[in-house]
Amino acid sequence: YVFHDYEKGLEHAKKENLPVMIDFTGWACVNCRKMEEQVWSDNEVKEILKNEIVIVSLYVDERTKLSEENQYETTLAGKPKKVRTVGDKWMVLQANLYGTNSQPYYVFIDHSGNQLIESANYQDYGTVDKFKDWLIRGLNEFNNI
């Protein structure tokens, strides 16, 4: 299951009793595409992603405008930031919750939004073996709750 909305993905995960992998990504993210093409395409990784978790892919550069009532102002890295687009919303979420704004960035969470294991990125988890191990550890942690 792949969702592009944090709340909807979390709701579905609760209903299906599956963990969530947040995938902070971007349309213009070269390493995101490399990860998808070289790592997610592996048969074992693909099976886990498809059947055992809910993926919430949040595009931090999505330009779709938020409705007026959903736009707001916040602080990002100590500076005022107007949140006007879907991408702005996800960028602020990533920065505020996880202290980073690089992509790809993967976070394994439970139904309450608690992080289950360390987060993953392309630099440290950009191989099939490392990413698969990370997924399995996340699943094991979720199943031990």
What are these regions, as identified by a protein language model?
Residues 1-22, 26-145:
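Proteins that catalyze or organize thiol-disulfide redox chemistry
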